[in-house]
């Protein structure tokens, strides 16, 4: 459906954020050096008492991931860890080369969405066959336990959402990313890791088409379904039509019939949904943000933003809390 070509930048602000992670590679792929963030005992005994989490739990602590890697989380002995950034490969990603969670492979956002900036692509998810192919290239199937992290909260959430939509049954994100991992005193490494290609995903992709809303469905449901709420996860200035939020979008405004779900200060953040330490808020935190909004959690909530990144953060928080009356209007304001 779409080509995996990085031709048009998502936005100056967003790319600036991601460029901190991905730039020129100053290290060779075969470097074996490892660093420690702090002197801290690194034993399996230390993480044996970390509490387990449910399969649908998305946001986990660094301590939980370390416990899983230490073999102290039953069923997560072979977890696949991946750093998410915007780009085609690990060797061009500066943050990955400078140091990543041990064992982490590299996954680019361009593996799940059209990044050509074309009118047809609209930064929507790639075709089911393309996403399945990219998952299999990393050895990821529906039964793989996946833990993602990245320097951009919404970019990482975008990939997690795509994996869940595709059918990966257990997808998690290290809340706070590599900074939280380092703060916990855990090691990083610099060697490049790659998964072993898998042959069969194990189910039809997408396994959860209900989590994706098209522009046609959004228009129809806004007009004809009182329980359907098209929820804008955009800044106040975007919501009020003062700015499109993007240097490649001339028109400002919102789809007719949409309601505002707050979430952002600019097109490049989800500041309303994060704590002071950079972690994503829990459900109670989201409820506080939404207490004056024109929807309830009993509505079907189709989240959208500019191109589909910010909208995935509230989706994941509701998903991990058992809500299924949720989706992402993928095309967003751009489409």
Indicate residue ranges for each PLM-predicted region:
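Sec-dependent N-terminal signal peptides of Gram-positive bacterial secreted proteins and lipoproteins
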Residues: 2-25
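Bacterial lipoprotein signal-peptidase II cleavage site
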Residues: 19-37
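Cytosolic catalytic domains that perform sulfur/thiol-centered chemistry
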Residues: 23-27, 44-335
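Extracellular mucin-like PTS domains
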Residues: 33-47
